[in-house]
Amino acid sequence: GPGTGTPTYTIQGDINIALRGGHGEFPRIVVIPGDPNEAIEKTNEAFYLSEKFNSLSIVLSDKHLAESEFSVRGKPNKTIIPKINRNIPGKTIVKASGYEHDKFGNTTEDATLLKRNAEARIIKYQKIKKEAKRFEMIKIHGKKNSKNLIIGCGSTKGAILDAIEGKDFKFLQVLYLMPISDEIRKEIKKAKKVILVENNLTGQLGRLIREKTGIKIKNR
């Protein structure tokens, strides 16, 4: 998860590498829970999406979330059991190649097939996003009709909830960084004042929101 930063402390410094690290253009799922229940739920969802779409999932935790004490209310959502549709070694021949390959696992440099594979990976991302909408990609806390909006993710959740208690604010908690919810742009558009809260210097969540919505959040 996000690096521990200064020893014994925490930081949300690895959002960018989780979203963009790797070779080439390929879909991935990145979730960022804010409490123990969400950690269980989002990890389960990540496994489900990984198995369904044969894609990489990353669950971003951090030291604060991992080592804090929580009073947990309620139980996590019912576990989703993913269906395993891939070939299992020992039952059939399985070929794995880091090179571009055909459906049989054989390496190829055929231009038509390379183009088709690249396009298929982008189409897969759209399918992942559509499927992820069945889950909570964001949560709205506080006064739902407030025009004062705070945006955050991960372990900043607890501090933000304490800060807005009894005040005219609502808190948009981002749970999916990739795919990211289209509702974020709608919520920002409805607000008069938007504040971004994240535990890093460069505003990595803010960069992602600007990239996907075209909106730069100045107050952070």
Feature-to-residue mapping (PLM):
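Short, basic, helix/turn surface patches
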Residues: 1, 17-28, 196-207
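Short beta-alpha connecting loops at secondary-structure transitions
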Residues: 1-6, 25-32, 217-220
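Short, well-ordered, mixed-charge alpha-helical segments that flank or form enzyme active sites
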Residues: 2-4, 38-39, 66-69
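Short linear motifs at secondary-structure transitions and domain/linker junctions
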Residues: 3-8, 32-36, 122-127, 169-172
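Amphipathic, alpha-helical segments enriched in basic
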Residues: 6-25, 89-96, 100, 184
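Conserved thiamine diphosphate
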Residues: 9-58, 62
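Flexible, low-complexity linker and terminal segments
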Residues: 42, 47-220
